[in-house]
């Protein structure tokens, strides 16, 4: 075969990392489009329609490709599908240990028949010999060495390489469940017991006078502080001092809060509820398990990869790190990263360690090699949702019903590798208060290593666990106080301008009270007593209950860095490129729709998972954005190419707000500096006596898009193809690339665009201009604008007067929230404990909705996932859990159609306050309140409270007995 070559015809752009030219390859997207091209253009175009003069999506823009089988996921590609690759596909299989208590002593493959022998076995000895290490983020011990005890259950021991499928399949069938394959020696202590905590956070706050003024003490006001570690546990200072350091003051006020709770409980002034809540280990159950395909082409010194990752940007840099040593050290000049559709993620494909095992296999393979988890392997090795143990106290003034204090000690099981556990612990702690205002709080979250499989950024990100506990406490303390839970909520609901547990003011209007009022008036709630009596009379052996819960989930990371580029062709076709991955949330569709606000038409093409195209902005990142000092930030910001963060990973709640921000700005700039002046030029030329008067078309805000055509002040509507041609002929802006940064506020800078200075919420901007015709270029030299596009085909604009959010905003931890509430009614079978969902109603505040149907889909999917978390899903810890390699859907119960009340679901999406409302990240919050609502509904039906999830039918039956 001919060796493949790397050129601009095959790859978009390149960047150089550690001497390796890295390419983000569009090949698989091109293949998907080629497949989709088999569908007639007329059929493909049916995803959009017009309603009252405005374009509306009928279904997702990849809908036709989906139902006709033309949408292909990364897991589906083989060597024969890849242009330039050898046709022979090799396969890899990872051996994993199911013992973390004994010294590993190796294995033998002598019993394998010759037809099932691997041609290469990669072990820890190879890694040591070749000096191969994992990227720092993932820790060490990529493969378990002989003579050591495993760090965790399911840890990789060896990788077997096969050059054909029959050999691979035969060997795997003989080895996968062979309990005697790996040999072990003497018993040892668990490795996790020798590790310090992954992270410890403490949020102490005491409000100022009446809660309206500056806090007496809080993380935002005073800063965060951390403990020392003694005997593998956090040890806090023992010298409280109200006038001392930040830590001494913090310990002083923590002591004051504890004393106030104790005293007020003793004198019966406050009702104090003390409870412990436990959540389980959850398998994310994405549609497609993780997969990798790779090949090193020695002839061209090119290392090819096909990855299914939510974070391909980080994969590029980390893969280069691995390739810098080992058998290919110095031999790889080009790294090609294909990022196709990943087949769902739920966070479990964000910074997963899996792709790096793929890189390792390809380093030693003699040809293309495929590493793909089956569902057993995904259960055993994939990222999990963290289990929490929360010991909490909630204190309420008996006379006013006002919450007086909240304390919690959270213990988080982070599994065998750190991954995002410190961040999950932090977010879980900040979410504890939910929608309620707490004048005093002391919330501690400590994450520990364990022998369980890794846990990571799974949907909910710690908030599902902590907010469920808070809602359960609200339910129970209302019961103790003998008050309606809505009355208790109304007395404590957080209002706009009040501070959270970190001392920060949440952004925007808080509409919690509005949602509570709507839910309280729902007929299911109003008639719950009569309905219970009626239902149980008509259905002997069944118990009826109603439950309600509300939650407000943060969205964002405090270091969001979206990018977008929009290009307008001379024919009026709109192309949008973004760095985001489509994970099933509808990003591809919503971003295509979003541009129509400014451009009057949907994007004709949306390219996802772009990485290297952003090289045109020449961005430089130097520091950790979470710990950078203000002085350092000010120093670096003077460089117009510097940014706190170059790129961000894709996650469920990030596209609607963060990605939309820069997409919207790019579209608006093309409108203001391209389409609008071009349209005015046409109107002046053809539809007005221009030499004798003025059209007064000076304000681009006068433009209106109707039926995809632009009109203004009564002038004839112009189609986008006509305007686009004129914009190109006039040398106007026809391409915009932008980058933004958000640390709970957007960075802003001035940019000079064709002589006009604009203040934009961007920190980098690059433009493309049309190739002006001499007929229209009367005030400038067309060649000058074309000559300015020297940065990968773009004119890179130097920013001025940059303003980044202050570094101390990191102490706010979160300030953007999206609320959701759920009301459920259930029936419980006394005989077997099975819960039937009779109905569910969800209220959601999503801000300005881009595509209503996508939001509705998130509501439905979130409800199903939340029901699974509450009633069905759960993995035992340790040796009986996922790490033993025997778990699959035959044992792990996910929500089925009969569990979720498919035809009994209702929802209310709150109307936006105005057209200027921001979109909100809602893809996680929609799964949270149903959990606590179900816990309360089960209590109302059975009079039994559950403090540990899941509430399986077996547990409910036993509790009722």
Give, region by region, the residue ranges found by the protein language model.
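C-terminal catalytic domains of large/alpha subunits in multi-subunit enzymes
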Residues: 125, 326-333, 364-368, 425-459, ...
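Flexible, low-hydrophobicity surface segments
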Residues: 32-223, 227-228
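Thiamine diphosphate
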Residues: 327, 343-366, 370-372, 380, ...
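Helix-loop-helix junctions that connect adjacent transmembrane helices in secondary transporters/permeases
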Residues: 209-324, 493-571, 808, 822, ...
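N-terminal secretory signal peptides
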Residues: 1-6, 10, 32-34
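Phosphate/diphosphate-binding loops
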Residues: 367-412, 661-687
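Short acidic, glycine/serine/threonine-rich loops at helix termini
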Residues: 132-136, 171-174, 316-318, 346-352, ...
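N-terminal export signals
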Residues: 10-31
């Amino acid at each position: 075969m001919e060796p493949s070559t790397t050129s601009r015809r095959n790859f978009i752009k390149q960047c150089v990392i550690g001497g390796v030219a890295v390419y983000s390859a569009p090949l698989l997207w091109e293949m998907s489009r080629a497949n989709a091209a088999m569908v007639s253009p007329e059929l493909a175009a049916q995803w959009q329609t017009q309603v009252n003069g405005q374009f509306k999506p009928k279904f997702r823009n990849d809908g036709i490709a989906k139902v006709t089988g033309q949408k292909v996921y990364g897991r589906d590609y083989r060597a024969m599908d890849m242009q330039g690759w050898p046709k022979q596909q090799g396969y890899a299989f990872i051996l994993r240990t199911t013992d973390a208590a004994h010294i590993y002593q190796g294995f033998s493959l002598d019993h394998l028949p010759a037809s099932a022998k691997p041609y290469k076995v990669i072990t820890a000895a190879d890694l040591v010999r070749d000096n191969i290490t994992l990227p720092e983020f993932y820790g060490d011990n990529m493969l378990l060495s002989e003579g050591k005890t495993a760090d965790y259950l399911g840890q990789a021991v060896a990788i077997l390489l096969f050059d054909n499928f029959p050999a691979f399949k035969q060997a795997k069938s003989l080895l996968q469940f062979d309990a005697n394959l790996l040999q072990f020696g003497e018993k040892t202590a668990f490795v996790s017991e020798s590790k310090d905590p992954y992270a410890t956070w403490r949020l102490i706050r005491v409000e100022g006078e009446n809660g309206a003024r500056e806090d007496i003490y809080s993380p935002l006001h005073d800063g965060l502080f951390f403990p020392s570690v003694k005997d593998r546990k956090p040890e806090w200072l023992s010298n409280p001092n109200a006038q001392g350091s930040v830590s001494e003051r913090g310990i002083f006020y923590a002591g004051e809060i504890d004393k106030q709770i104790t005293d007020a409980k003793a004198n019966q002034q406050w009702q104090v509820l003390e409870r412990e809540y436990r959540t389980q280990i959850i398998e994310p159950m994405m549609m497609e398990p993780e997969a990798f395909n790779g090949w090193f082409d020695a002839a061209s010194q090119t290392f090819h990869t096909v990855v299914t990752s939510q974070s391909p940007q980080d994969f590029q840099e980390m893969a280069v790190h691995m390739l810098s040593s080992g058998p290919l050290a110095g031999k790889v000049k080009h790294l090609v990263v294909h990022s196709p559709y990943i087949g769902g993620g739920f966070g479990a494909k964000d910074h997963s360690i899996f792709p790096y095992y793929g890189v390792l296999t390809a380093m030693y393979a003699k040809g293309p090699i495929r590493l793909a988890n089956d569902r057993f392997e995904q259960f055993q090795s994939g990222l999990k949702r963290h289990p929490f143990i929360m010991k909490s106290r909630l204190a309420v003034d008996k006379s006013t019903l006002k919450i007086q204090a909240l304390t919690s000690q959270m213990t988080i099981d982070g599994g065998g590798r750190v991954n995002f556990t410190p961040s999950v612990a932090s977010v879980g702690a900040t979410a504890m208060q939910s929608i309620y205002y707490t004048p005093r709080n002391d919330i501690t979250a400590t994450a520990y290593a364990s022998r369980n499989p890794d846990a990571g950024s799974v949907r909910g990100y710690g908030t599902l666990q902590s907010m469920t506990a808070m809602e359960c406490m609200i339910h129970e303390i209302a019961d103790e106080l003998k008050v309606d839970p809505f009355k208790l909520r109304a007395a404590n609901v957080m209002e706009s301008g009040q501070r959270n547990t970190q001392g920060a003011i949440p952004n925007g209007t808080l509409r919690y009270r509005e949602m509570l009022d709507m839910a309280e008036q729902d007929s299911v709630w109003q008639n719950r007593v009569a309905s219970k009596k009626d239902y149980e009379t008509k259905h002997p052996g069944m118990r009826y209950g109603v439950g309600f819960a509300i939650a407000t989930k943060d969205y964002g990371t405090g270091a969001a860095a979206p990018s977008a580029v929009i290009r307008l062709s001379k024919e009026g076709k709109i192309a949008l490129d973004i760095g985001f991955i489509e994970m099933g949330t509808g990003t591809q569709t919503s971003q295509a729709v979003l541009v129509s606000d400014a451009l009057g038409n949907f994007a004709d093409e949306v390219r996802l998972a772009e990485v290297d195209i952003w090289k045109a902005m020449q961005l430089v990142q130097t520091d950790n954005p979470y710990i950078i000092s203000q002085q350092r930030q000010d120093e670096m910001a003077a460089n117009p190419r510097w940014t706190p963060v170059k790129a961000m990973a894709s996650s469920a709640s990030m596209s609607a707000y963060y990605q939309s921000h820069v997409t919207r700005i790019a579209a608006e700039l093309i409108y203001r500096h391209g389409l609008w002046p071009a349209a005015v030029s046409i109107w002046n030329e053809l539809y007005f006596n221009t030499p004798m008067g003025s059209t007064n078309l000076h304000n681009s805000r006068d433009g209106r898009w109707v039926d995809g055509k632009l009109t203004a002040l009564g002038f004839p509507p112009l189609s986008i193809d006509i305007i686009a041609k004129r914009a190109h002929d006039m040398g106007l802006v026809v391409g915009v690339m932008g980058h933004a940064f958000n640390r709970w506020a957007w960075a802003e800078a001035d940019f000079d665009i064709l002589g006009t200075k604009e203040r934009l919420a961007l920190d980098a901007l690059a433009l493309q201009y049309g190739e002006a015709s001499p007929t229209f270029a009367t005030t400038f030299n067309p060649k000058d604008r074309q000559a300015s596009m020297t940065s990968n085909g773009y004119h890179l604009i130097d920013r001025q007067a940059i303003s980044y959010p202050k570094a101390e905003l990191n102490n706010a931890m979160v300030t953007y929230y999206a609320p959701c509430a759920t009301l459920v009614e259930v029936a419980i079978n006394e005989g077997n404990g099975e819960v039937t969902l009779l109905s569910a109603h969800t209220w959601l505040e999503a801000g300005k909705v881009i595509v209503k149907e996508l939001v509705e889909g998130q509501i439905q999917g979130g409800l199903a996932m939340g029901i699974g978390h509450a009633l069905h899903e759960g993995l035992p810890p340790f040796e009986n859990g996922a790490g033993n390699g025997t778990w699959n859907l035959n044992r792990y119960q996910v929500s089925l159609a009969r569990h979720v009340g498919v035809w009994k679901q209702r929802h209310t999406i709150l109307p936006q306050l105005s057209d200027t409302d921001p979109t909100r990240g809602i893809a996680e919050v929609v799964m949270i309140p149903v959990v606590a609502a179900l816990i309360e509904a089960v209590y109302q039906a059975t009079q039994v409270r559950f403090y540990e999830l899941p509430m399986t039918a077996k547990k409910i039956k036993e509790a009722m007995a």
